[in-house]
Amino acid sequence: WDASTEGRERVVIDTPRTKSVIGFTDGDAFDLGAVTIRPGVTRQGWSTISVTLMEGEGFGEAGSVLIAATGDVENTNMGWKDATRTSVGRNWGEAPSLVEAVTASVSFAVGSHRVSAWALDERGQRAEEVDVVSEDGHARLQLGPPHRTLWYEVEIR
């Protein structure tokens, strides 16, 4: 937990199987070894982006990866008491929940020819392929609202 700069508080997780940035991270780049996460601008300046190795020995090896990326969350017609958004009292709203799909890029320290990616639907099934581009010899994919998802699958060959 890094709370050294007011308004930029964040948690960075860097383990062999999970890389994650949580908090007020808009516009910063996080080089976590074989994975780099660059959160974009969000409604509240806050997001959570997690990159988890589901299969394989490491992010530079063959395997599969799950990415989850979210920002602002609230129920439909949720009634905040004031602009600080610290309480809704008893006005929790109703379904469906509304979740901000954040803009971010995630890069892997492997060639783009080794990587395929998909946006996942609400059942965890592949919904559409996501472009993977080469940037400085690394495979980079762009997350965001056009994909209409919070979850992505990445396959490294």
Model-derived segments and spans:
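Alpha-mannosidase-like glycoside hydrolase catalytic domains involved in N-glycan trimming
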Residues: 130-133
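Long, low-hydrophobicity ectodomains and other hydrophilic envelope-associated domains
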Residues: 1-119, 123-126, 136-138, 145
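C-terminal beta-strand-rich structural cap/linker in extracellular carbohydrate-active enzymes
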Residues: 137-157
